[in-house]
């Protein structure tokens, strides 16, 4: 029986995880399509570029990875202690490199004064974003969604590019 990833990933047990993402509809992630002769090798660079970008934002280290013709493998280290050491401002600066943030976070970073109610919601948002910065699911979501959108645009199609959300296995299980 399958388990939700939030139940599979326990940073108290291990911080290292092996994540796998597979393509659907016989889509090529990279390599050459034997039937059409079309090369998708440039997509490997998409993955490497996005990995470099998000590795600077998230508190997750990429220990190893492999990009195959229709799937990827990543060995990730989730560093929640690093995320907890970040200042509130550092958390928001990192988060805003990938996402727009909220009105409260934008005002805070702009140096605007926040009333007590806004400060209350800002504190909740910072706590949530801090947790996400060491969350493997969020890391894989950002990576896979970016690649899927580019590949779907290139392939002139819509819908899922990856079969399921990425699967995370502890290194013991892998």
Residue ranges of model-derived segments:
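Short catalytic/metal-binding and nucleic-acid-binding patches
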Residues: 1-174
């Amino acid at each position: 029986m399958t388990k939700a990833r939030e139940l599979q990933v326990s940073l108290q047990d291990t911080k290292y995880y092996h994540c796998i993402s597979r393509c659907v509809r016989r889509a090529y992630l990279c390599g050459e399509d034997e039937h059409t002769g079309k090369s998708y090798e440039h997509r490997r660079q998409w993955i490497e570029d996005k990995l470099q970008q998000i590795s600077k934002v998230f508190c997750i280290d990429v220990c190893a990875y492999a990009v195959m013709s229709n799937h990827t493998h990543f060995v990730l280290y989730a560093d929640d202690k690093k995320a907890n050491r970040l200042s509130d401002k550092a958390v928001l600066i990192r988060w805003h490199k990938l996402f727009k943030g909220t009105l409260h976070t934008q005002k805070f970073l702009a140096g605007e004064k926040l009333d007590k109610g806004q400060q209350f919601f800002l504190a909740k948002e910072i706590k949530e974003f801090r947790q996400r910065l060491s969350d493997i699911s969020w890391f894989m979501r950002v990576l896979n969604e970016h690649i899927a959108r580019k590949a779907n645009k290139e392939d002139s199609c819509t819908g899922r590019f990856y079969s399921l959300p990425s699967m995370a296995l502890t290194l013991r299980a892998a």
